[in-house]
């Protein structure tokens, strides 16, 4: 069975939605393509414009750009090591095993606020206001600044209780780290499900079907 999702909720600009639908349905014409190309700005540098995130096709490209931007900051660096207990496959780590930050670093939250205060959500962009060996304060674009606490993720295994026929959860391991990652750049793949106010798309090395569409629809 094939299910087609036809309504775009992430974007509200009717003209842009029309362009996205035309790309998705492979019916874009020269007029729509010209409208899209109006957003092509040769020589645009995200270093000169605050709050932009670069969407890249490959992990190493995003990592190199983030490392470059972090190294350019004059403030001291602090590294936070994740606390891993029990069985937790490294390939499934939900956050950085080693998170290095400086004051002024652009970061993205990678999960929703668990405190119930709604201070941040998965994909929200902010900047590190202060950082010490034991404290991180992030200021977001809406002006709110707050202490960020470490989050814990569980690696769970599910089994069927033969007696009750109920599914039971068994936690095999846990991963504890600050729910942040450097966010001057991320991969298009990791941007799926997220929405950004300002983005620059670097899709010159795109390799997967639909990759450019995913980037444009962020």
PLM regions and their residue ranges:
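Conserved helicase motor core of P-loop NTPases
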Residues: 1-118, 125-129
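C-terminal accessory regions
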Residues: 108-218
